[in-house]
Amino acid sequence: MNSQDEIHLLLQTFQDGYIRRDLTQVDTFMQLFSDDAEVIGTNGVAPGVEEWYRDRASARELVVGDWEGWGDLRIDLDAMSVRHRGDVGWVAAPATVTKIIGEDNYASFLDFVKHLLDDSKLSPEQKLLHILRGGTNTVYELRRGEKFVWALRFTAVVVREANGWKFAQMNFSFPTIYFPDVRLME
């Protein structure tokens, strides 16, 4: 099997794990990553903060969280771009995350509001702005239907180790046409 096919097999194995989402197999699944793999989830803002993991052991938290409740990840393996030079390769692919949302999202948002109101770090104005934005988004999205499909970009760097190709870096990102959700304030 050539390197291109081996990298495709790594991606197929990754996709299969996300399809099954068997939490009893998460440690075996994590063997797809190098020990020092860096994994950046959609909530990753800075190294070591939120969903920006600096090694395989900590990246396990992202995988478990995804498998428990993120949604149905589907990487378009037919449209992915795979390149490699020697023992290093890089991958880019369109993907989707599909989740069925429903009336329980109203209650979930209200639970968020309760916790937000107790947050002493935010000013009353900031709390109100978060409530207004989140409430509007919740109503808007639920009125559009219960099937919610996010477009996603999946990129990764892979390296060939003694026991095969492994993920050395991975990034999940959402395209956006409006203001991004995270804004750094000076």
Where are the language model's segments positioned?
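Short beta-strand edge/turn micro-motifs at domain boundaries
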Residues: W90, D104-L132, T136-L142, E146-R183
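Short, aromatic-enriched amphipathic alpha-helices that serve as compact interaction elements
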Residues: S3-Q25
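A solvent-exposed, acidic/Ser-Thr-rich amphipathic alpha-helical stretch
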Residues: Q4-D5, Q25-P94, K99-L117
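Alpha-helical packing segments of well-folded alpha/beta enzyme cores
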Residues: L10, F14, L62, F154-A156
